[in-house]
Amino acid sequence: MKKIILTTAIGIFLSTSVLSGHHENNEVVLPAKITKNDIAGDIYKHPDMVKSTNNGNTTLDVTTLVSSDGKFGTGMYRSGKIRFEITEPYGVDEFFYILEGSITLISADGTVTKTNAGEAVSIPKEWTGIWDTDGYSKI
């Protein structure tokens, strides 16, 4: 009987902890939302937007969420014209939806995957090849 009561008490405690939406340090965990206005471009006005220029290409990057284990992130990214070869495995599994522009991915075996605005693509972390674009925005 003690075992049943203890198991029930632990179950109630754990479910209450999970359902309360609190972290270990008692912070409330909230969903990360990207609004229609953000998607239309307002997100790039956020104060935490990171702008970088490398070899004449300017990128805008806004991270809206990084998981507590650091293995998952969300946000929006905009890039100008760029072409680069990825000779080492990509390093992360990535899914994204293209809002504007297009990206052409040429795999190491020559297979061409062109993804346009309104389409999505998933890149496995083992992927190598050429990334080519005249510019795009992705979520």
Where are these regions (language model features)?
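Short, conserved beta-strand element in jelly-roll/cupin
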Residues: 90-105
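A short, N-terminal "cap"/entry segment at the start of jelly-roll beta-barrel domains
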Residues: 19-71
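Conserved short histidine dyad/triad with adjacent acidic residue
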Residues: 73-90, 124-125
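Ligand-binding loop in jelly-roll beta-barrel domains
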Residues: 125-139
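Short hydrophobic/aromatic-rich beta-strand segments that constitute the beta-sheet cores
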Residues: 74, 86, 105, 138-139
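Short acidic-glycine-tyrosine-enriched beta hairpin
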Residues: 109-125
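Positively charged n-region of N-terminal signal peptides that target proteins for export
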Residues: 1-4
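Hydrophobic helical h-region of N-terminal Sec-dependent signal peptides
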Residues: 6-10, 14
